[in-house]
Amino acid sequence: IRLSLVGSEMCIRDRSVQTAEGALTEVHSMLQRMNELAVQAANGTNSKDTDRKAIQDEIDQLNTEIDRVAETTKFNEIYLLKGDDGTKQINLNAHDAGLKGSLTDKGDGTATFVMDELKAGDAVSIGGKNYTIAATTTDTDDLITKASAKNTDIVINGKTYKYQAAKGAGDDSSAAAAKAGYYEEGVAWAAGAGKTADGLKTLAAAGSTVEAAGKKLTSLSTAEATAGVSASNQSVITDKMAYVKAQTELLSANQIGDTVGNAAVYKAGTTAAATLADATNKFDIKVGKAEVANTLSFSLHVGADADMTNKISVDIDTMNSTFLGIKGLNVTDKNGTAATYAIDAISDAISKVSSQRSALGAVQNRLEHTIDNLDNVSENTSSAESRIRDTDMAKE
């Protein structure tokens, strides 16, 4: 009876799970603060040299403290958040760099991203900068054809060409009547000055801007099309240039926390980066990896005897910045793009901590019931033991 009593009381005293969960509560709080700072750094009104540097300083301190908590939290000389002996490589989550499209993380260290297909005149944001997709002369010719079919006014390189409707009743001899169905620059209809839709197309040569029916297209010269960008307006780029820029941002977003150097972005179906000559809207991604300590595993013995069913298994991953995918987090770039990508990385870190806390919480809830039962056993065993000790053997 004494053996059972002492064993039960020893089981009740174990607080290793509570210690680990309590430490993770603080890690969780620090990550929430880092998220606030990253959002603040992503704001375009910050100064690179002052505001963002101050924000970076606090993020660095929080990262250091997270590592310290992971390195030093222990119960009965067992380090709970440091991991176990040996190392392993883990895959980080794939990110879409805020681009519009469909991201598929396959869970095997690879992902695919299909960016929304870009067409002439589309507006797109890449890496925090806004661009307009350039047109070809085929695109501008098609716009003129569709606009003329609806008798819509057309603007070419800033000049408006108004459509002249058919003559009205009693207007047989007017110059306007003679030019019915034609386009003319301005509102005056001088004899012989009318133009057909095909005539307007000759004015919309490569390098022109055409506006009609609520749509605006800018075509590029041959040299500009080869370079992928307008010489006079750097925000006008070809669709292929947009895909190349998107590839660069995808790589930046997926390199955060990649301590192994595994992250890469390729043109879909290849192991080479897309170029201006062959870029498409489809990408293959090798996600970042981190080398971390093995998972710590131990068992809590919750019974007074040697029955192996009196075991509750506990698994705790190392909870340092490397495992969380935020090691070396940087928010000091000029336009706040790095801070924007950092928000995704911090969100992943919060999810990891939440998952570990959830697992520990489940064990702790089970332990609460186990402890209540052990309290019951201990109390009744103690009562029985006392009665036996107090028995008057002479009377018996």
Q: Predicted regions: what is each one?
A:
Residues 2, 7-396:
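Primary detection of the long, small/polar-rich alpha-helical "axial" segments characteristic
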